[in-house]
Amino acid sequence: MDKLTPKQKAFADNYIENGGNATAAAVSAGYSKRSAQQMGAENLLKPVILGYIAERQKEYD
């Protein structure tokens, strides 16, 4: 399995913590405000990020 980059991990952690706002998670992770919406959407299509989010969400169940 591929590993998350530090920025991808920060995105995923912020996405979980903010209740699922991908744009805000991208900005918090360090993506530019200009590209945050696009990068948030792209990150949610990456299996490695989705897998990490799913594993983290199990901790809350």
Residue map of PLM features:
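N-terminal, charge-rich alpha-helical recognition modules
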Residues: 1-61
